[in-house]
Amino acid sequence: MSAGKTVVIALGGNAMLQAKEKGDYDTQRKNVEIAASEIYKIHKAGYKVVLTSGNAPQVGAIKLQNQAAAGVSPEMPLHVCGAMSQGFIGYMMSQAMDNVFCANNEPANCVTCVTQTLVDPKDQAFTNPTKPRWRFYTEQEAKDLMAANPGKILREDAWPAGWRVVVPSPRPLEIVEYGVIKTLIDNNVLVICTNGGGIPCKRENKVISGVDAVIDKDLATSLLAKTLNSDYLMILTDVLNACINYKKPDERKLEEIKLSEILALEKDGHFAAGSMGPKVRAAIEFTQATGKMSIITSLSTAVDALNGKCGTRIIKD
């Protein structure tokens, strides 16, 4: 029975922007409207829904706009750009959900919560930034940029080609607004939160402040789901299942799988760090901590996956 059960859902980046699409507002809005229609089906099936998403294209565009306009308007730090992206994404998502509710003659019981995520300021990610972001540079441009901006680090990125700024990606430790989110869920509000993994922050001497970093949205969503004691964690991506030997002749889809089995596959290196790896890790951590099912599947198959008909479903041993 789904009645009253909570599912925390991480939307993949393709829910807002497909590969090679122009990142204009209308394109993203139309994609979000499609996603909202699918999320509504989960709500209609009786689940309480908490919705998160990535923000890489959006925060990247905002940061580039800030840099381009720095001569006429002060450039904002990365954590502020992250907050701006949460407002943009939350606006699109909550409006799309409100419209779906209204079209189905239901109250628009949906809200966006700007979310801060605490990290350890001593996390090794701050001394070894690894997450590539924003535009590509030639090698000479990268060297000139680093020479002119001490502390800025660029590294060569193999795909498609060129050099990119790398930023820290510390591990998420706490969702600051957890209590508010829990209250909203308990009152049957569909909550949109933790977009882009949350705004990276630190707490020192009981004072919270932003830090320039990015947080993996799947790990942050897993943390949120654990903290809420959610009944399910669902990570939506552009494939139906996690696979081993992906796109090889011996590719195998993972369907219902025990925690110990997927841990062994992870240890053997079956899940790439830049794609399925973080999603599998996030799912593992949720099921390890709660003993409850985590699901990896596509947006269009979400309800069927909750019903055990498809998707990768990780269960305790």
Curated annotation (Swiss-Prot):
Lineage summary: Eukaryota, Metamonada, Diplomonadida, Hexamitidae, Giardiinae
Pfam families: AA_kinase
Protein name: Carbamate kinase
InterPro entries associated with the record: AceGlu_kinase-like_sf, Asp/Glu/Uridylate_kinase, Carb_kinase
Annotated catalysed reactions: hydrogencarbonate + NH4(+) + ATP = carbamoyl phosphate + ADP + H2O + H(+)
Top EC class, one word: transferase
Annotated EC: 2.7.2.2
GO molecular function terms noted in the UniProt entry: ATP binding; carbamate kinase activity
This protein's encoding gene: CBK
Keywords, alphabetical: Arginine metabolism, ATP-binding, Kinase, Nucleotide-binding, Transferase
GO BP annotations listed: arginine deiminase pathway
Metabolic or biological pathway, per its Swiss-Prot or TrEMBL entry: Metabolic intermediate metabolism; carbamoyl phosphate degradation; CO(2) and NH(3) from carbamoyl phosphate: step 1/1
One CC-aspect GO term: cytosol
